[in-house]
Amino acid sequence: MDKEKGLLIVLSGPSGVGKGTVRKKIFEDPTTSYKYSISMTTRHMREGEIDGVDYFFKTKEEFEALIKDDQFIEYAQYVGNYYGTPVQYVKDTMEEGHDVFLEIEVEGAKQVRKKFPDALFIFLAPPSLDDLRERLVGRGTESDEKIQSRVNEARKEVEMMNLYDYVVVNDEVELAKNRIQSIVEAEHLKRERIEAKYRKMLLEVKK
């Protein structure tokens, strides 16, 4: 039977919900076989982040040059910074049969949905907006004004969870990781994803 094309797994949610933490937990698991699609951004590197591992960090000028070159699946501006997903790596990796894991902001996920309607969209939600505020304050990296801006944005983003296939509440990182892995495993077993392969196999048997 032909190799199954990989899934594009899109993990999205409000800033501060713990997308990066959950993603790291998933990739620390030795059973994980997904390939991570590293996003590009113009925001400042946070303590502990590594260029080319967590993000590709670019200047605004570099990023805008890549936009003109049509080098992104999606890009968006969020709280004054650009975020984007380089396109070629994603396409090539999926064709090789690997699942590609993409961690992006909500605005970017909307663009991906238009270009990759068959992708798997998972919304990572906070237990509450108060919990989200506490996480943002706990980072100790932003002013009260910027934190309030992110919480206000999160309110709008939570209202858009109906655009996603699944919602995972990040009340505990290990549980969120397990839920996401279970969703991906189940998605591979969906009839629509394998029916075409079997139809082709049956046609070849008849020849």
From Swiss-Prot:
Cross-referenced SUPFAM superfamilies: P-loop containing nucleoside triphosphate hydrolases
Domain of life: Bacteria
Residue sites binding ATP per the record: 13-20
Compartments where found: Cytoplasm
Catalyzed reactions: GMP + ATP = GDP + ADP
InterPro entries given in the database record: GK/Ca_channel_bsu, Guanylate_kin-like_dom, Guanylate_kinase, Guanylate_kinase_CS, P-loop_NTPase
Keywords (A to Z) from UniProt: ATP-binding, Cytoplasm, Kinase, Nucleotide-binding, Transferase
Regions annotated as coiled coil: none
A single MF term (Gene Ontology): ATP binding
GO annotations of cellular component type: cytosol
EC number: 2.7.4.8
Enzyme class: transferase
Segments forming domain Guanylate kinase-like: 6-185
CDD domains: GMPK (cd00071)
Family: Belongs to the guanylate kinase family.
Function: Essential for recycling GMP and indirectly, cGMP.
Record protein name field: Guanylate kinase
Lineage, opening ranks: Bacteria, Bacillati, Bacillota, Bacilli, Bacillales
